[in-house]
């Protein structure tokens, strides 16, 4: 390439590149689900059976303030959710024989709709922390203990649960962050320097917090999650210490919400240990049937979702090649902007090659791809692109964010009374 620009490309899929090309190594996954043990409309049995019928491979119940167990064991009963006795009926879990059949793929539901031979993997020891915060500063913990169980949580405090989960030996991700930022009122909140600095600080200090949700359910209050994700990548990657993985979960509270967002994990074998490794290393794709900024306000994905069938990085020539099915368009994104778009006439197979050198003026430190089709959207994790001088893209520190550290800076605004005043009562006095 002579004097042309050379990039060192960090490929999160390098360890599974060959596995991507085999259907057997793709695992349809949801790691954020609820039941009547917390605040959902459907029982655990109803949720499990629907996930099973919809050919999911891996499922975690991350209930509000309740640590998940194997599905044939009764989860803890938290007094906050006793209203379910009057509201949505009895709680219900499966028995040991049913659990075994679900895991080995021999379980029969009323619909009997499952097409896969393998079973549905249970992911225990998951929890959604800060179970009663009105502003929804929620954190999901995995492979953790009961340190966050039954804890209401402090408004605006992400750090306490992240720290507890890390101390337990677990990992975490931040849930629907721009819902907390009230993006439904101000979509540009994801670009406010103080907001970016707030989350960047958490990711710097807690490596066990492996990422954030970028796709969640119907993509209504959290539609700016991808904007925030790109802003964080621009800040953190040039520092040379970490990236942020983008997760997709349905956050289902009803069976009708189950197939709205999920992930395609690429695993060498079907095991919890491999799942954790994949969560830490970013060897998965995030998928959704709703993505308002990318697909349109009224778009609803129908049918087969886009899938990646091959992904190769050629560092010598500075290219990344992605092959997909069930899609019409592949877009490459850098710094939150689309820098290349490749299309075919109708949904089907597509191959897209990006030359980093050709787009060097628009690439700071990463690129990521998204595949669009009638079924929805698929997003890859970011590929770090280092031209040898990443440090020049490291920005000056933004205004110091207000971060709760052990409660020293806990103010009235961080109480439930303060939230009610600031978000519900105070605005009514404004003209």
Question: Residue ranges of each PLM-predicted region?
Answer:
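A metal-dependent hydrolase metal-coordination microenvironment
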Residues: 7-185, 217-229, 249-252, 374-383
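Short loop/turn motifs at secondary-structure junctions
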Residues: 55, 207-208, 365, 379
């Amino acid at each position: 390439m002579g004097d042309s620009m050379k990039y060192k490309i960090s490929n999160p899929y390098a360890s599974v590149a060959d596995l991507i090309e085999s259907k057997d190594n793709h695992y349809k996954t949801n790691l954020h689900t609820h039941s009547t043990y917390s605040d959902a409309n459907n029982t655990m049995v109803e949720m499990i059976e629907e996930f099973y019928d919809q050919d999911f491979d891996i499922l975690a119940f991350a209930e509000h303030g309740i640590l998940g167990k194997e599905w044939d064991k009764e989860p803890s009963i938290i007094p906050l959710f006793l209203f379910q006795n009057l509201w949505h009926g009895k709680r219900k879990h499966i028995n040991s024989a049913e659990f075994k059949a679900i895991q080995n793929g021999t379980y029969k539901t009323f619909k009997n709709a499952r097409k896969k031979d393998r079973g549905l993997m249970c992911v225990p020891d998951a929890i959604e922390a800060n179970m009663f915060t009105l502003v929804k500063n929620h954190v999901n913990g995995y492979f953790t203990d009961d340190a966050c169980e039954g804890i209401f949580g402090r408004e605006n405090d992400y750090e306490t649960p992240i720290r507890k989960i890390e101390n337990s030996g677990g990992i975490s991700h931040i849930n629907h962050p721009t819902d907390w930022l009230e993006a439904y009122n101000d979509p540009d909140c994801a670009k406010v320097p103080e907001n970016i600095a707030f989350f960047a600080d958490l990711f710097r200090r807690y490596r066990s917090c492996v990422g954030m949700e970028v796709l969640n359910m119907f993509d209504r209050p959290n539609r700016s999650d991808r904007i925030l994700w790109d802003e964080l990548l621009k800040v953190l990657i040039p520092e040379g210490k970490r990236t942020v993985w983008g997760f997709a979960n349905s956050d289902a509270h009803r069976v009708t919400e189950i197939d709205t967002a999920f992930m395609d994990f690429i695993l060498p074998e079907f095991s919890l240990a491999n799942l954790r490794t994949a969560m830490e290393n970013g060897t998965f794709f995030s998928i959704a049937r709703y993505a308002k900024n990318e697909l349109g306000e009224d778009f609803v994905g129908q049918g087969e979702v886009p899938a990646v069938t091959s992904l190769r990085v050629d560092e010598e020539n500075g290219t990344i090649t992605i092959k997909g099915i069930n899609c019409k368009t592949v877009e490459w994104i850098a710094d939150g902007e689309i820098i290349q778009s490749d299309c075919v006439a109708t949904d089907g197979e597509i191959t897209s090659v990006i030359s980093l050198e050709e787009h060097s003026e628009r690439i700071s430190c990463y690129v990521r791809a998204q595949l669009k089709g009638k079924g929805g959207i698929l997003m890859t994790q970011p590929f770090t692109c280092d031209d040898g001088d990443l440090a020049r893209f490291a920005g000056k520190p933004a205004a110091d964010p207000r971060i709760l550290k052990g409660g020293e800076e806990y103010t009235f605004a961080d109480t439930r009374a303060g939230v009610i005043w600031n978000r519900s009562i105070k605005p009514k006095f404004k003209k």
